[in-house]
UniProtKB/Swiss-Prot annotation:
Organism: Artemisia vulgaris
Modification after translation (UniProt): Glycosylated. High-mannose oligosaccharides (Man(5-9)GlcNAc(2)).
Listed name of the protein: Allergen Art v 2
Domain of life, source organism: Eukaryota
Other remarks in the entry: Consists of 6 isoforms with different pI. The IgE-binding epitopes are not significantly affected by the deglycosylation of the allergen.
Keywords, sorted A to Z: Allergen, Glycoprotein
Length: 71
């Protein structure tokens, strides 16, 4: 079995913690997907193209990726 160090650090723990906050904010939950590390890094790099670092905000609205719902 895989270990993640301290209790509360599994991928499911992170998804659960985010969804607790999303629920408080009235947002739909996120689910853990089956994306590999390289793809996750590429998604983050691609999103950086749509970010205005001087104004510290996204240039495009959340959910600008085809097939994804807004945050």
């Amino acid at each position: 079995x895989e270990t993640y160090g301290e209790p509360g650090n599994t991928p499911d723990d992170y998804v659960h913690a985010h969804n607790n906050i999303r629920r408080v904010l009235g947002m739909x939950p996120k689910x853990q997907g089956a994306i590999d590390g390289s793809s996750x890094v590429q998604l983050x790099l691609d999103e950086x193209l749509d970010y205005d670092y001087n104004x510290n905000k996204x240039i495009k609205p959340p959910g600008n990726v085809v097939g994804q719902l807004p945050y």
